[in-house]
Amino acid sequence: MALEKLTPAAGSTHATKRIGRGQGSGNGKTAGKGNKGQRARKGYNEKRGFEGGQQPLQRRLPKVGFASKFEKPYVINVEKIAAIKELAEISIATIASVHKISKSVTKIKLIGASAKALASKIKDENVSVSGTK
């Protein structure tokens, strides 16, 4: 068997539809475009989403929502997890050792009444405390 001897399976290929090549072809004269009108003219190209003058679906539906491109920090209440107060230095790695957090967390915010006292222990720029600048 040689590659040049291969043929497509029976019925898998179809002849190209030749438009505007005489009445005998079944697609002559108006070439399947009907009689007159904008769509019958040469160069006509319908805009994406055009619905024949009816208000397009994209304009009928209301605008919805907003998505911020800034990532929200993972919030931890220091009052609920006492082990964070006892850490010598605070970073994402040390917090992960005492509190279960996802690997996808890249920013942490500590909240609570005693959170401000921990500000001096923070050694990671991705960990912040509420109420401090």
From Swiss-Prot:
GO terms for molecular function: rRNA binding; structural constituent of ribosome. Belongs to the universal ribosomal protein uL15 family. Binds to the 23S rRNA. GO terms for biological process: translation. Residues 1-57 are annotated as: Disordered. The keyword ATP-binding does not apply. SUPFAM superfamilies: Ribosomal proteins L15p and L18e. Residues 21-35 have a biased composition (Gly residues). Part of the 50S ribosomal subunit. Keywords: Ribonucleoprotein, Ribosomal protein, RNA-binding, rRNA-binding. This is Large ribosomal subunit protein uL15. One of its GO terms (cellular component) is cytosolic large ribosomal subunit. It comes from the Bacteria.
